[in-house]
Curated annotation (Swiss-Prot):
Gene giving rise to this polypeptide: nit1
Listed EC numbers: 3.5.5.1
Name assigned to this protein: Aromatic nitrilase
Catalytic residues identified in the record: 49 (proton acceptor), 131, 166 (nucleophile)
Catalyzed reaction equations: a nitrile + 2 H2O = a carboxylate + NH4(+)
CN hydrolase domain location: 9-283
Length: 320
């Protein structure tokens, strides 16, 4: 599509509580939110990281051994990309007529991956990527994405849609490669992250993670949607975090929408509020921002600094 005209696109960022470790209820809630966004005129919609079946914060405060039963349940309630459950979600996206980036814990054979599926308004999965490096203790439970997951932007009827998961936003080269793919609207899929406190380092706070994503809007001259989860007080015990002072419930949400100069486009919701944030955006505003800052164009020095990217995905099995 042409980005030069006055066409307005409505974007939608989810902030909601998952149906913890319950695949079927998680699919049902996902469908409800998609239909709601469609009825409210959304064109592009983003969901949090591992929205289905929710982010397991217990992996940060309990040992792998202590989490065996919990994570077994988590595995069984993770979503397969090629499944009846995904087909139901795809049908809802088609009914709503939107472009959706769905974050979920992907179950593939015997492994889990932190994944995003890009679903167009026809209900087709036009791209699928996995977090290339799960963060810290996450590596005990989720596998890594390969070179095909470096592609993070796809063309759509509503502009070029990109997406990254959580601390992938700290991967400077990965961000840069997304800018080089000419992203217009970026879906920043985050889990629930709580406010700054003495128990955790500041870089694992909603304040810092929000700032990091805001910088991506400015740096990439793109519209950015922070999509995050929340946790209610009654679900703390269910998630094995009821005795952890770092967890403030209800809370964990920090969803937001930013413009291509890094400006906030909506009022930030309360950290414990379930809401879909909406903003009407004009993609042509990107070019105004690019006049000043185009880090993959006029404000770059490829003769001095450049990025090397592989596009050959590694495989466990090779045929002679």
């Amino acid at each position: 599509m042409s980005h030069d005209g006055p066409k307005t696109i409505r974007v939608a960022a989810v902030q909601a509580e998952p149906e913890w470790n319950n695949l079927q209820k998680g699919v049902e809630k996902t469908i409800r939110l998609i239909i709601e966004a469609g009825k409210n005129g959304a064109n592009v919609m983003g969901f949090p990281e591992v929205w289905i079946p929710g982010y397991p914060w217990s992996i940060w405060n309990q040992s792998v051994v202590d989490n065996v039963e919990f994570m077994d349940e988590y595995f069984r309630n993770s979503l397969e990309r090629d499944s009846e459950e995904m087909n139901r979600i795809r049908c809802a996206v088609k009914e709503a007529g939107i472009f959706c980036v769905l974050g979920y814990s992907e179950r593939y054979q015997g492994s889990l991956y932190i994944s995003q599926s890009f679903i167009d308004e026809n209900g087709d999965i036009v791209h699928h990527r996995r977090k290339i490096k799960p963060t810290h203790v996450e590596r005990g439970f989720w596998g890594e994405g390969q070179a095909d997951s470096l592609k993070s932007v796809v063309k759509s009827s509503f502009g070029n849609i990109g997406g990254l998961n959580c601390w992938e936003h700290t991967q400077t080269l990965l961000r840069y490669y997304e800018y080089a793919q000419n992203v217009d609207i970026h879906i920043a899929s985050w889990p629930l992250i709580f406010g700054a406190c003495a128990e955790m380092q500041y870089h694992i706070s909603s304040e810092m993670c929000g700032k990091l994503t805001q910088v991506m809007s400015m740096e990439g001259a793109c519209f950015t949607l922070i999509c995050s989860q929340v946790m209610s007080a009654e679900n703390c015990e269910r998630n094995k975090v009821d005795k952890w002072s770092f967890v403030k419930a209800p809370g964990g949400g920090f969803s937001m929408i930013y413009g291509p100069a890094g400006e906030p486009l909506v009022e930030a919701p309360d950290a414990g509020e379930e809401v879909i944030l909406y903003a009407d955006v004009k993609l042509a505003e990107k070019w105004r921002a690019k006049q000043n800052l185009d880090v993959v164009g006029h404000y770059s020095r490829p003769d001095l600094l450049s990025l090397k990217v592989t596009n050959n995905a590694a495989s466990q099995v090779h045929f002679a």
